[in-house]
């Protein structure tokens, strides 16, 4: 049997796996246990009451977190003409069409998000086998295929997160860094859950948001008591 590290022993002692923690307590616990030598991300797992086997119950989209993600995001944009200039002015690191596609084919992908205008999809479509497995393929549902590429670039830079349920109906994404304030992390979490509720498939029955857990990069998951979150959808 593998020997537990000091860090793992501390986590086991501090975190009650069967308890739903009030949000303030959950965040304080994460911060206390974040002892890595780098600034850890704060991630969230949201268990949704959907049947992930059915395409009409899958949840996918994007939302801009009010306090960003704490990450520097590099954006590549496939577009041309006036849109190309607008994308550059909005802060895109790479802008092009066939020339940008050639870089991707060579494996030169120094970017985190790909945006495309509709007229560029004839070029981007040829890159599906490269971009798809990396989660970089532009999609209208996440706002990355759009005539307004400048806005998409600004959203990506401002802290937009994309979400998509896995085969078990769970959404995994980030809500910031462990050096964010407790208030910033709570606001980001609440904003994400509101976005997920707005994206609820009409075919989903029963309890929709079943469980919410937060964790740091190197830490254990801490279940959050949803009653301590403000996530009412108007």
From Swiss-Prot:
Protein family according to the UniProt entry: Belongs to the universal ribosomal protein uL1 family.
Lineage: superkingdom: Bacteria
Pfam families: Ribosomal_L1
Gene3D superfamilies hit by this protein: 3.30.190.20, 3.40.50.790
GO biological process: regulation of translation; translation
Gene Ontology MF annotations: rRNA binding; structural constituent of ribosome; tRNA binding
Entry keyword set: Repressor, Ribonucleoprotein, Ribosomal protein, RNA-binding, rRNA-binding, Translation regulation, tRNA-binding
Organism encoding this protein: Pseudoalteromonas translucida (strain TAC 125)
GO cellular component term, pick one: cytosolic large ribosomal subunit
Subunit structure: Part of the 50S ribosomal subunit.
Protein role: Binds directly to 23S rRNA. The L1 stalk is quite mobile in the ribosome, and is involved in E site tRNA release. Protein L1 is also a translational repressor protein, it controls the translation of the L11 operon by binding to its mRNA.
Protein name in the entry: Large ribosomal subunit protein uL1
InterPro entries: Ribosom_uL1_bac-type, Ribosomal_uL1, Ribosomal_uL1-like, Ribosomal_uL1/biogenesis, Ribosomal_uL1_3-a/b-sand, Ribosomal_uL1_CS
